[in-house]
Amino acid sequence: IAAEGATVTIEEVNYDECVRMAAAEADACERGVIVQDTAWEGYEKIPSWIMEGYGTMASEAAEQLREMAINRPTHVFVQAGVGSLAGAVVGYFTNLYPDNPPTFVVVECAPAACLYKGAAAGDGDPRIVDGDMPSIMAGLCCGEPNILGWDILRNHATAFVSCPDWVTARG
């Protein structure tokens, strides 16, 4: 990114705060645009395009399963940060197998388990985790769910798992 002329900084805040900082920078620029997969009220178009791209990955996985004579997976485990990838994968396979979808298990990093907490609350509302989220799963340390992904996951995921680092370290 720096090689393309962008200013790159390292900030001492969590992912969600960095997203807000980047969005503010984009808003301050005459032709600024933020491109990332976290969606919030009023910022949904670009994240939906990114989720469509993730859906292409799910389509390719489904094709590979068919090539191996697996007509339908029984279970789909998918990692989640903000829930964009997870929402796209769950949405794709739910639409592919509407009468008998697989069991969907959404796996999150324990310190940032906003989707898990939203599901555990049982009221359909997303939950936010803030502050420091120390984990070896740094790319999944996102405490604010993508509202588009959350809507899919809360309606179609079978289970949510809050995964501690020791599980990840064991592979």
Named regions from a protein language model:
Residues 29, 145-171:
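Active-site-adjacent helical/loop segments in soluble small-molecule enzymes
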Residues 9, 34-35, 77, 105:
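Structural detector of well-ordered beta-strand residues that form the stable sheet scaffold
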Residues 34-42:
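Active-site phosphate-binding strand-loop segment of PLP-dependent enzymes
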Residues 21, 41-155:
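Glycine-rich phosphate/pyrophosphate-binding loop at beta-loop-alpha junctions
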